[in-house]
């Protein structure tokens, strides 16, 4: 008979915590990570994953504290450096985030996630050429990174390099037929290249699966307008506005494909 239960083993606590992380239960995991570090303050695995859990809960400053503790123990922990940068970006410290992404790359020039994250941040800062350079580097290191390939297509589109963007999304969709975002953006790039009939075929297929998707409905309105299917374009634009008036109105006012609707009172009523 056992009268006094001993402390739970650190390894067992850590195993349980990581199980919660896999189940996307960061709150439960955090309680266990705290127990681990109470027993073993220098346990970098617990400290690092505690930081990841806090990031998931959007407690970014607390996450930074965890990553700093890891880096105090191991200044060359590239994952901690990279995730510290993510936390900094989330709190709006873009300068600090870029500094730490660069630090991660300097620590390990083959660490693809830092190039990818730095590319995404450059894109958000509207520095699209720098974004593309970083995404290209991420793909050079990890050619199978679907996230980097997809984001590369997005940036190419923003740079008006639509043939390259289309090729990018086609390749992703060919390898990953369930990647609906790539399929959607394939349609968008076809529209940008004036291939509206083919774009509409894609949008129709998507609406069979996601009939209420406002982005697809709006994209279909654009292509119908470009093909002078005015009544259909007006109808679809109205349907999109019912779902998200503020956003769709903003897009419609700036939309080049709606130039031929500017004299239509129905269009003006929608965007008024």
Predicted stretch roles:
Residues 36, 69-70, 103-104, 137-138, ...:
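Canonical positions in the second alpha-helix
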Residues 1-12, 16, 246-272:
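Terminal, low-structured helical/coil segments at or just beyond the last alpha-helical repeat
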Residues 14-22, 34, 45-56, 79-90, ...:
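Conserved alpha-helical positions within TPR/SEL1-like repeat arrays
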């Amino acid at each position: 008979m056992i009268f006094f239960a001993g402390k739970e083993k650190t390894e067992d606590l850590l195993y349980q915590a990581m199980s919660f992380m896999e189940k996307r239960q960061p709150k439960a995991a955090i309680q266990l990570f705290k127990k681990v570090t109470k027993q073993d303050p220098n346990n970098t695995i617990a400290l690092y994953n505690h930081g990841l859990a806090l990031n998931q809960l959007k407690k970014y400053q607390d996450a930074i504290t965890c990553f700093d503790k890891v880096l105090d123990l191991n200044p060359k922990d590239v994952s901690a450096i990279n995730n510290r940068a993510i936390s900094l970006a989330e709190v709006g410290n873009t300068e600090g985030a870029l500094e730490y992404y660069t630090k991660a790359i300097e620590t390990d020039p083959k660490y693809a996630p830092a190039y990818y994250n730095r590319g995404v941040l450059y894109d958000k800062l509207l520095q699209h050429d720098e974004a593309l350079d970083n995404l290209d580097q991420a793909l050079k290191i990890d050619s199978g990174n679907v996230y980097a390939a997809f984001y590369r297509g997005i940036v190419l589109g923003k740079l008006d390099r639509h043939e390259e963007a289309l090729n990018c999304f086609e390749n992703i969709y060919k390898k990953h037929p369930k990647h609906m975002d790539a399929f959607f953006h394939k349609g968008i790039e076809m529209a940008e290249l004036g291939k509206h009939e083919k774009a509409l075929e894609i949008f129709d297929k998507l609406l069979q699966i996601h009939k209420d998707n406002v982005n697809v409905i709006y994209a279909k309105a654009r292509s119908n307008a470009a093909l002078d299917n005015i009544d259909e374009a007006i109808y679809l634009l109205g349907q999109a506005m019912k779902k998200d008036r503020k956003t769709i109105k903003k897009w419609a006012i700036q939309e080049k494909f709606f130039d031929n609707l500017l004299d239509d009172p129905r269009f003006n009523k929608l965007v008024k």
